[in-house]
């Protein structure tokens, strides 16, 4: 632990011009920060992500099954409508002289309304699937971010002891004193 503390203290000193030292510019160390964050996200979020995706997949499959049941109901309605259509066609042959155009109009309206119902059910199924996918993606993103943040905070809290904290503060105070002397 003392070696780790000494390495932090030695990294805390401002290097002279042209030498190697700790870079505190967050924009210059962005690649390192990104790799650390990605590593933490992958390490802590892998299991949770797979569980969430499996749960979401099951829900989506259930939604698809429900949509298929609705579709089967619509097909059943379509068959009933076709049976009714056949009946109407038989009656049309009998009453052709009394209103052929009226019966034909009834037939077209029945077919159109059935197809519209089928289209609406298909659109509803597709919208439901898309909505569930988007909601799942958003939930997974939020959960992974929360767990990565909790893991990072836990790691920081477990690594930062009082002794290390005091040494870091003293080293920073020493640096600020040296900077103040240079600027005065």
UniProtKB/Swiss-Prot annotation:
In the bilayer, the protein is annotated as:
Single-pass membrane protein
List, in alphabetical order, the Gene Ontology terms for molecular function in this entry.
proton-transporting ATP synthase activity, rotational mechanism
Q: Name one GO cellular component term.
A: proton-transporting ATP synthase complex
Q: Which InterPro entries match?
A: ATP_synth_b/b'su_bac/chlpt
Keyword Iron-sulfur assigned: no
Q: Which residues cross the membrane?
A: 27-49
Q: Where in the cell is it found?
A: Plastid, Chloroplast thylakoid membrane
Functionally, this protein is described as follows: F(1)F(0) ATP synthase produces ATP from ADP in the presence of a proton or sodium gradient. F-type ATPases consist of two structural domains, F(1) containing the extramembraneous catalytic core and F(0) containing the membrane proton channel, linked together by a central stalk and a peripheral stalk. During catalysis, ATP synthesis in the catalytic domain of F(1) is coupled via a rotary mechanism of the central stalk subunits to proton translocation.
**Additional comments on file?**
In plastids the F-type ATPase is also known as CF(1)CF(0).
User: Which protein are we looking at?
Assistant: ATP synthase subunit b, chloroplastic
Which organism is the protein's source? Manihot esculenta
Q: What is the lineage of its organism?
A: Eukaryota, Viridiplantae, Streptophyta, Embryophyta, Tracheophyta
